[in-house]
UniProtKB/Swiss-Prot annotation:
This is DNA-directed RNA polymerase subunit beta'. Keywords: DNA-directed RNA polymerase, Magnesium, Metal-binding, Nucleotidyltransferase, Transcription, Transferase, Zinc. It is an enzyme of class 2 (transferase). Belongs to the RNA polymerase beta' chain family. Zn(2+) 2 binds at C818, C892, C899, C902. Mg(2+) binds at D449, D451, D453. Binds 1 Mg(2+) ion per subunit. Binds 2 Zn(2+) ions per subunit. It comes from the Bacteria. Pfam families: RNA_pol_Rpb1_1, RNA_pol_Rpb1_2, RNA_pol_Rpb1_3, RNA_pol_Rpb1_4, RNA_pol_Rpb1_5. Gene3D superfamilies: 1.10.132.30, 1.10.150.390, 1.10.1790.20, 1.10.40.90, 2.40.40.20, 2.40.50.100, RNA polymerase II, clamp domain (4.10.860.120), RNA polymerase Rpb1, domain 3 (1.10.274.100). It catalyses: RNA(n) + a ribonucleoside 5'-triphosphate = RNA(n+1) + diphosphate.
Length: 1213
C-alpha cells in the first residue's frame, strides 16, 4: 500500500476502455453468484475466486494449498492465487460488452457534456442512444447534413434513394464514432473565432462549449471515453452476499444490477452469433444500455429498476450520495473502537479535569492495557489467561485497572456536537453504578443536563493522541468560549443561588457589629451561632496581608459580612477583596467607604450604610474572566472548583424552598384590568364610528393589553420581598426570569393564534388563580408551537452550520504576517441611536493597521501593527476615539487562509493565535452554534405598511446565501443630494430624485415604503433610500468589495446582537471573505482564461502576473458574491465539494477536467485518511520528534508551563 501521508495531490479523470481492462483481474462472464448447495462462489460469476481472490486467508478454492507457506502460488487445479482474503476488497473484474454503451453521467447531466462536445441537443442524443432515430455519420455526396437525425422511415427512404453513398447509424456506437470524429483543437479554434463577434444566447453557448472542449484538450481525456466498451465490476466484498438464518440470502443491490447487465450482454452476444434480425438486436442493445444506466445511476432516466417490494435498487451513484453515502457515512465519519456510551449523571465531587467512569465500562475500554499489565506483573501467565481473568472480573484486575487509567485521559462527546467544546478530554475516576459522571461546570459547554442525556466516551490510544488530549483538550483549558472570548464555564443554578445567598446582607441579624481579628475567628463565631452569614461585621485588614489593600486601608477594619469573608477566601491570594458587585471593586480594589477609621463606632457606621446587593450570576462570570486574565488557566480551574463546592454547600444550608404561599396576589390587578377593558371599549367605539381602520383598532387593542401586563409586572416587582425564594432564584440568575413570575402571580397576557397572529383575547388569570377552560385551550396552542419551532430550528441551524463549515474548512492560519498594506476602518455598529456593537468589542484582540492618536491632544495611544489588549482598548475608547483602522481577514493577503496579524487574538485562549489553528472551522461553529437561540419568525412591522422584516435565523441564511432579501431597500447609484421626494397616490408610488455631480437618477418606490433619507440629505453611492435590507449583489456593483463586506458584517452582527448573542467580528469576517473570494473574468486580454469564468482571486492574480511578465495584456474581472452553498461547491477541491452536495455533478465535471485536488483543506485530507494540515499536522510541525517528558502532575495543565520546563532542561544541558 502507498503511504497516504506522502500524497501531494489526488487526480480524477475518465477511464479509457484499456484502463478498465488493466484494472481487472479477469472477465465476469456469468450472472451466477454463489452455489446454494456448497455456498462456494461460482466459476466466472460475480464472486469468482479466480478473479477476485480466495474467500479464506491463505487457502485456494479446492483446498489443495493451505497455510501461509504457499503464499503467491496459483493453484493448478482451481486457478486461485493463495493470498489474504482481504484482496477481495480491492481486486476488480470487468464485463466485456457486446456493444458500446454511453455513460449516463455524461449524457444526462446538466448541461449534457456529450451534447456540448457534439453540439447536439440532449433530446437528439437520447433518440440516438435509445434507438429511436438514426444519425448521419458521413454524408458523402448526398444533400444530407452530418449529425442530422433520420427516423426509421426516412432512413429507409434515403437508403433506397442514395444507397451506400452516406452512412447513418444509431445507438452508442453512432455516438462513439461521432465523438471519435471530433477534432478538439479545430473546434476550439472555431469557437474562439465565434466568440469575437457573437452575443447573447449564441455567445453563452459558445463559451460553454469552449469550456468543455478546452477541458478535454488540457486534461488529455478522450471524448470517446464517455462511451464504454467494458465496464468495471467492483470488488465482491464491497457488494457482499450474506446468508441469513433460515437459509435465505441477503445481497447488495449492486449484484442484482450487475446480473441484469451480464444477462442482457450474454443474450446480445448470442443474438449476434445467430445473425438475428436487426430489430431484435437493436432492442437487446437498448436493453443493455438501460441496464448499464441503472447500474451507474438508477432512476436518472425513466423509471428506476425496482427490487422486491417495489423498492428502487441502490446503484453506484447512490452509494456515494447523501448522508448515507460513502462520503458522509464512511469517509468523513467512522465508527471507532475503544468507545462506549452511557447515561450521564452529575458528579459534584469531581475536579474540573475529571469525569466519573463506571467500573464495568473502564474494564472493557481499557481491556488490552489491563491484559498487558496483568502479564507484566505476573498475575497472569499469558494473554489468554489475562483475558479470562478480566471476563470473570477477578479481584486482581481492579488494582491493575486503577493504575492503568491513571493519567490516561479519555474524550467525552455529546451529540449534537455544535462547536469544538462538544468534545473535551477528562481524566477518568472510577465510580460505581452504570452512569458516567460529568462535572457540573462542563454542562454549559456540552449543553448537557441530567434528565436522561447520554454521552459517548473515546479512549485515545497512542502516546501522541494522549499528549494531545491532555495538552489541548483537557476540560480545564476550555474556560473561554471560542465565539466571544467570554467564560463558558460559569456557575449555574444551585452554585449561583449558594453564592448569592452567601453574599447577601441583612440589617439587624444576630451578631451585627461584632469585630473579628481574622476570618477563622469569624467562621468559628458563625459555626457556634454567634453571628449569621448575613450579619454585617468588622474584620481586621491586617489579617489579610496578601490582599492588595492601600496602606491606609491596612490599618483599618473592613466592614463586610461573614458570608463575603468566606467567599473572598476562595479567590486567589493577590486578588482584590470583593465587597460589592461592581467593576470598580473588581479591578481597582475595595472602595474606601467600607473601612472603619480608628476610633469610629461600627454601629453608627452601619446605620449610615446602605445594603449592598448580593453577587449575581453575571458578576460571578466577571470574576472568572478577570481571574483568567490575570492568573491564566490553572488558577481559574481551581477557583471554579472552589466556587462550585462553596455554592453547593451554602445552597444546601440556605434551605431554599418554594411553596404556593410564596406567590402572593396583587391587589391592584382588578383595577388595572378594568381600566384596560374601558380603553378597549373606547377603541371599538372609534372603529364602529369609522374613525380608525380595522388594522389600527387591532394594533391599539394589542397595545392596551401589553401595557396592562407591563403595569402588573411593574407593580409585582415593586411589591417583591427580597427574601422571597422565587425572587431570589430569578434575581440571582439561577433559574427563571421576571416573566415567569408575572405568569404565576400577575396575568398570562396575550397568546398567538395558530396562524401566528396575536389574539385580541388576553388570558387574564394567572397560574396561582388557575385558568378557565377557554383560557387553558387558547394557551395550549402556544405550547405546541414552541415545541415544533424548536424542532424546526434545530434542523435548520444544524444545516446552516454544515454549510458554513464546508465553505470555510480550508481557512487555516498559515503564516505569521502577510504584509498587507490595507486595513479595515471600524467604528461602533449603530442602529438608529442604539449601539449594537461598541467599538471596544470590535477592536479588542485585533492588530492596528495605522497608529491611533488621541483626538484632543494628538498624542500617540497605540502604534501600528500592535495587538490591542483590554488595557489599550480601554485607553482608546476613553480617549474618545471613534474610528480605528485594524488588520482584518477581509484585507489579508495569505493564500488559502489568514495570517496571525490579520486574525489577531485566539478568543478561546486569550493569547495570540498560532500558525496551524483551524480558524475557519471555529468561525463556522461560532456562527452556527448559537443558531438554535435565534428566532424562526419573520416579524411583521405591523401597522398599515405590512412590511416583513426578516430576522433571526432566516435573516442569517438570507445574508450568507446572498439571496434577494425580503423587504428590499432601493440604493442610490450616485453620490449627491436628495432633491425631491414626491408621492404619486394614483400609482401608489413615491419618486425619489438624487442629483449627483455628473448625473441625476430617479428611483420609484412603493407608496408604503418608509424613507431612510429626506429631502436635502447628502448621500453616498450605495446608501439605502428606504428602510429595509440592501441586496449585496446590487451593492457590490455600485460600491467596492470592502463596503459590501462591511455591510454584510454589520447585518450579521445586528441579527445576533439583537437576540443577545455575542460573536466576535473575526468569525463573521472569515465567512464573508469566503463568499467573496471569486471573480468573474470580463475580458481575458492575452491570458488563457475564458471570458465569464469564475476564478479564485489568488489564481486570477497569478495568471495576470504570468501574462504581464511575458509582456501581454492582463485580464480584467469583476468581483462576484456567492452564497455559501455555491461557494462551497466552487472550491478548488473536488473531494470537498463532492462530499458536500450534488455529488454526481461535481464528480462528472471534475473527471472531464481531470481535476487535481491539492489537498489543502481539512475535509479532503480526512477523506483520504491523511493527517490534516492544521495544528500539529502542519508541514512545519510534521518532522518534530516528541520529547520524553516525565509524568505531568495534577496541577500542571498548561502548555506554556511544559514549554518552560523543556527550555530550562535544554538550558541546563
Amino acid at each position: 500500500m502507498i503511504d497516504v501521508n506522502k500524497f501531494e495531490s489526488m487526480q480524477i479523470g475518465l477511464a479509457s476502455p484499456d484502463k478498465i481492462r488493466s484494472w481487472s483481474y479477469g472477465e465476469v462472464k456469468k450472472p451466477e453468484t454463489i452455489n446454494y448447495r456448497t455456498l462456494k462462489p461460482e466459476k466466472d460469476g460475480l464472486f469468482d475466486e479466480r478473479i477476485f481472490g480466495p474467500t479464506k486467508d491463505w487457502e485456494c478454492a479446492c483446498g489443495k494449498y493451505k497455510r501461509i507457506r504457499y503464499k503467491g502460488i496459483v493453484c493448478d487445479r482451481c486457478g486461485v492465487e493463495v493470498t489474504r482474503s482481504k484482496v477481495r476488497r480491492e481486486r476488480m473484474g470487468h464485463i466485456e460488452l457486446a456493444a458500446p454503451v454511453t455513460h449516463i453521467w455524461y449524457f444526462k447531466g446538466i448541461p449534457s457534456r456529450m451534447g456540448l462536445v457534439l453540439d447536439m441537443s440532449p433530446r437528439a442524443l437520447e433518440e440516438i442512444i435509445y434507438f429511436a432515430s438514426y444519425v448521419v455519420i458521413e454524408s458523402g455526396n448526398t444533400p444530407l447534413e452530418k449529425k442530422q437525425l433520420l427516423s426509421e422511415r426516412e432512413y429507409r427512404e434515403k437508403k433506397a434513394q442514395y444507397g451506400n453513398e452516406f452512412e447513418a447509424a444509431m445507438g452508442a456506437e453512432a455516438i462513439k464514432r461521432l465523438l471519435n470524429n471530433v477534432d478538439l483543437e479545430k473546434e476550439a479554434r472555431d469557437l474562439k473565432e465565434t466568440l469575437k463577434d457573437a452575443s447573447g444566447q449564441k455567445r453563452t453557448r459558445a463559451v460553454r462549449r469552449l469550456d468543455i472542449i478546452e477541458a478535454f484538450v488540457t486534461s488529455g481525456n478522450e471524448p470517446a471515453w464517455m462511451v464504454m466498451d467494458a465496464i468495471p465490476v467492483i470488488p465482491p466484498d464491497l457488494r457482499p452476499m450474506v446468508q441469513l438464518e433460515g437459509g435465505r440470502f441477503a445481497t447488495s443491490d449492486l449484484n442484482d444490477l450487475y446480473r441484469r447487465v451480464i444477462n442482457r450482454n450474454n443474450r446480445l452476444k448470442r443474438l449476434l452469433d445467430l445473425n438475428a434480425p436487426g430489430i431484435i438486436v437493436q432492442n437487446e442493445k437498448r436493453m443493455l444500455q438501460e441496464a448499464v444506466d441503472a447500474l451507474i445511476d438508477n432512476g436518472r432516466r425513466g423509471r428506476p429498476v425496482a427490487g422486491p417490494g417495489n423498492r428502487p435498487l441502490k446503484s453506484l451513484s447512490h452509494m456515494l450520495k447523501g448522508k448515507q453515502g460513502r462520503f458522509r457515512q464512511n469517509l468523513l465519519g467512522k465508527r471507532v473502537d475503544y468507545s462506549g456510551r452511557s447515561v450521564i449523571d452529575v458528579g459534584p465531587f469531581l475536579k474540573m479535569n475529571q469525569m466519573g467512569l463506571p467500573r464495568q465500562m473502564a474494564l472493557e475500554l481499557f481491556k488490552p492495557f489491563i491484559m498487558k499489565e496483568l502479564v507484566k506483573r505476573e498475575l497472569a501467565s499469558n494473554i489468554k489467561n489475562a483475558k479470562r481473568k478480566i471476563e470473570h472480573a477477578d479481584d486482581d484486575v481492579w488494582g491493575v485497572l486503577e493504575d492503568v487509567i491513571k493519567e490516561h485521559p479519555v474524550l467525552l462527546n455529546r451529540a449534537p456536537t455544535l462547536h469544538r467544546l462538544g468534545i473535551q478530554a477528562f481524566e477518568p475516576v472510577l465510580v460505581s453504578g452504570k452512569a458516567m459522571r460529568l462535572h457540573p461546570l462542563a454542562c454549559e459547554a456540552y449543553n448537557a443536563d441530567f434528565d436522561g442525556d447520554q454521552m459517548a466516551i473515546h479512549v485515545p490510544l497512542s502516546d501522541e493522541a494522549q499528549a494531545e488530549a491532555r495538552l489541548l483538550m483537557l476540560a480545564a483549558h476550555h474556560i473561554l468560549a471560542p465565539k466571544d472570548g467570554k467564560p463558558v464555564v460559569t456557575p449555574s443554578q444551585d452554585m449561583v443561588i449558594g453564592n448569592y445567598y452567601l453574599t447577601t446582607e441583612e440589617i439587624g441579624r444576630e451578631g451585627e457589629g461584632m469585630i473579628f481579628k481574622d476570618l477563622n475567628e469569624a467562621q468559628k463565631a458563625y459555626q457556634s451561632g454567634y453571628v449569621h452569614l448575613h450579619s454585617r461585621v468588622g474584620i481586621q485588614v491586617s489579617s489579610m496581608p496578601d490582599k492588595p489593600f492601600t496602606d491606609d486601608q491596612k490599618q483599618a477594619v473592613l466592614v463586610t459580612t461573614v458570608g463575603k469573608a468566606i467567599f473572598n477566601n476562595i479567590l486567589p491570594g493577590k486578588f482584590p477583596y470583593l465587597n460589592e458587585p461592581t467593576n470598580d471593586n473588581l479591578i481597582a480594589g475595595t472602595p474606601d467607604k467600607y473601612f472603619l477609621k480608628p476610633g469610629e463606632d461600627i454601629h453608627q457606621f452601619l446605620d449610615a450604610q446602605e445594603i449592598i446587593p448580593p453577587f449575581k450570576k453575571g458578576f460571578l462570570a466577571d470574576i472568572i474572566a478577570e481571574v483568567y486574565k490575570q492568573y491564566h488557566v490553572t488558577a481559574t480551574s481551581l477557583l471554579l472548583d472552589r466556587m462550585k463546592d462553596l455554592g453547593y454547600n451554602i445552597s444546601t444550608k440556605s434551605g431554599l424552598t418554594v411553596g404556593v404561599a410564596d406567590i402572593t396576589g396583587l391587589k391592584e390587578k382588578p383595577a388595572i384590568i378594568a381600566e384596560a377593558h374601558k380603553q378597549v371599549n373606547t377603541i371599538s367605539k372609534q372603529f364602529r364610528r369609522g374613525l380608525i381602520t380595522d388594522d389600527e383598532r387591532y394594533e391599539r387593542v394589542i397595545g392596551v393589553w401589553n401595557d396592562a401586563k407591563d403595569q402588573i409586572q411593574q407593580k409585582l416587582i415593586e411589591s417583591f420581598n427580597a427574601d422571597n425564594p422565587i425572587f431570589m432564584m430569578s434575581d440571582s440568575g439561577a433559574r427563571g426570569n421576571i416573566s415567569n413570575f408575572t405568569q404565576l402571580a400577575g396575568m398570562r397576557g396575550l397568546m398567538a393564534a395558530p396562524n401566528g397572529k396575536i389574539m385580541e383575547l388576553p388570558i387574564l388569570s394567572n397560574f396561582r388563580e388557575g385558568l378557565s377552560v377557554l383560557e387553558m385551550f387558547i394557551s395550549t396552542h402556544g405550547a405546541r408551537k414552541g415545541m415544533t419551532d424548536t424542532a424546526l430550528k434545530t434542523a435548520n441551524s444544524g444545516y446552516l452550520t454544515r454549510r458554513l463549515v464546508d465553505v470555510a474548512q480550508d481557512v487555516i492560519v498559515r503564516e505569521k504576517d502577510c504584509g498587507t498594506d490595507r486595513g479595515l476602518r471600524i467604528h461602533a455598529i449603530m442602529e438608529g441611536n442604539e449601539v449594537i456593537e461598541p467599538l471596544y468589542d470590535r477592536i479588542l484582540g485585533r492588530y492596528t493597521m495605522k497608529t491611533v492618536f488621541d483626538p484632543e491632544t494628538h498624542d500617540e495611544i497605540v502604534g501600528n501593527n500592535v495587538l490591542i489588549d483590554e488595557d489599550l482598548a480601554h485607553k482608546i475608547v476613553d480617549a474618545g476615539v471613534t474610528e480605528v483602522t485594524i488588520r482584518s481577514a477581509f484585507t489579508c493577503n495569505t493564500k488559502h487562509g489568514v495570517c496571525e496579524h490579520c486574525y489577531g487574538r485566539n478568543m478561546a485562549t486569550g493569547d495570540e493565535v498560532e500558525v496551524g489553528e483551524a480558524v475557519g472551522t471555529v468561525a463556522a461553529q461560532s456562527i452556527g452554534e448559537p443558531g438554535t437561540q435565534l428566532t424562526m419568525r419573520n416579524f411583521h412591522t405591523g401597522g398599515v405598511a405590512g412590511d416583513d422584516i426578516t430576522q433571526g435565523l432566516p435573516r442569517v441564511q438570507e445574508i450568507v446565501e446572498s439571496r434577494n432579501p425580503k423587504g428590499r431597500a432601493e440604493i442610490s447609484e450616485v453620490t449627491g443630494t436628495v432633491e425631491l421626494i414626491e408621492e404619486n397616490p394614483a400609482e401608489r408610488t413615491k419618486e425619489v430624485t438624487v442629483k449627483g455631480e455628473t448625473d441625476t437618477r430617479t428611483y420609484t418606490l412603493p407608496l408604503t415604503a418608509r424613507m431612510a433619507v429626506s429631502e436635502g440629505d447628502f448621500i453616498h453611492r450605495g446608501a439605502a433610500l428606504n428602510i429595509g435590507s440592501i441586496d449585496p449583489k446590487q451593492l457590490i456593483q455600485v460600491r467596492d468589495v470592502l463596503s459590501t463586506e462591511n455591510y454584510l458584517l454589520r447585518e450579521v452582527q445586528k441579527v445576533y446582537r439583537m437576540q443577545g448573542v455575542e460573536i466576535g467580528d473575526k468569525h463573521v469576517e472569515i465567512m464573508i471573505r469566503q463568499m467573496l473570494r471569486k471573480v468573474r473574468v470580463m475580458d481575458p486580454g492575452d491570458t488563457d482564461v475564458l471570458p465569464g469564468t469564475l476564478m479564485d482571486i489568488a489564481d486570477f492574480k497569478d495568471e495576470n502576473y504570468k501574462t504581464l511578465i511575458a509582456g501581454g495584456i492582463p485580464a480584467t474581472s469583476r468581483p462576484v458574491i456567492l452564497g455559501i452553498t455555491k461557494a462551497a461547491l466552487e472550491t478548488n477541491s473536488f473531494l470537498s465539494a463532492a462530499s458536500f452536495q450534488e455529488t454526481t455533478r461535481v464528480l462528472t465535471d471534475a473527471a472531464i477536467r481531470g481535476k487535481n485536488d491539492p489537498l489543502i483543506g481539512l475535509k479532503e485530507n480526512v477523506i483520504i485518511g491523511k493527517i490534516i494540515p492544521a495544528g500539529t499536522g502542519m508541514p512545519v510541525y510534521r518532522h518534530i520528534k516528541p520529547k520524553e517528558v516525565g509524568n505531568v502532575a495534577d496541577g500542571v495543565y498548561s502548555i506554556s508551563d511544559l514549554e518552560k520546563q523543556m527550555q530550562e532542561q535544554d538550558a541546563s544541558k
